[in-house]
Amino acid sequence: VVAAGYESKEILGTVGIDVPMSRVLIEALVTEAEPHMFDQMLGTAEADFYGHQTKHGSFVFGGSSGYEAVNKDNGTPICSSITAPCICRGIMKYFPDLADAKIVRTWAGWADQMKDGVPVLGNVSEVPGLVLATGFCGHGFGIAPAIGHELADLIVDGKTSIDINALRYDRFKAKI
């Protein structure tokens, strides 16, 4: 099983598999504790931000500005002066009560993303026994329990309980 995020590309390259993926810089911020507002994980259709309020009361939000691609700094993920304000503007559209919330810290990191934005999950026919799970672009934590269950079924039983054909690696092969 190769489930190594962006590093899957390098690992798979050692057996001649070229996975069309890139890494995407994403940033996050955390606020001081605030009064309880909600328990759900939130995200917007406009992709302004995503996040949740912790039991402690602080908010953890993430997002992007669209300018992260120019801020790669030789491979070191660093926070820009652009992204946190963009995330905050998105938050303010929905939660104006957070206008005075203080940001405690910000950080940046890499997410793995497939060329078509859809993760790869399943067997790789070119290498018998190889199972791939990569390209989740930050969604891996949210869907990890379901992915783990389906991977276990695939490895043990040779099949999954749901149809994962749309996630197969060979969708990137030329169709002649």
Question: Where does each model-flagged region fall?
Answer:
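Oxidoreductase and adenylate-handling cofactor-binding alpha/beta cores
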Residues: 16, 95-97, 153-156
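Active-site lid/adjacent beta-loop-alpha segment flanking the redox-cofactor pocket in flavoenzymes
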Residues: 33-129
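Catalytic-loop motifs flanking and including active-site residues across diverse enzymes
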Residues: 4, 83, 87, 143-147, ...
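A short alpha-helix-loop-beta-strand transition element characteristic
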Residues: 19-21, 100, 158-164
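Central helical "cap/lid" subdomain
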Residues: 2-38
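C-terminal lid/capping helical subdomain adjacent to the catalytic/cofactor pocket in oxidative enzymes
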Residues: 125-176
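Hydrophobic alpha-helical segments typical of transmembrane helices
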Residues: 7, 24-25, 38, 87, ...
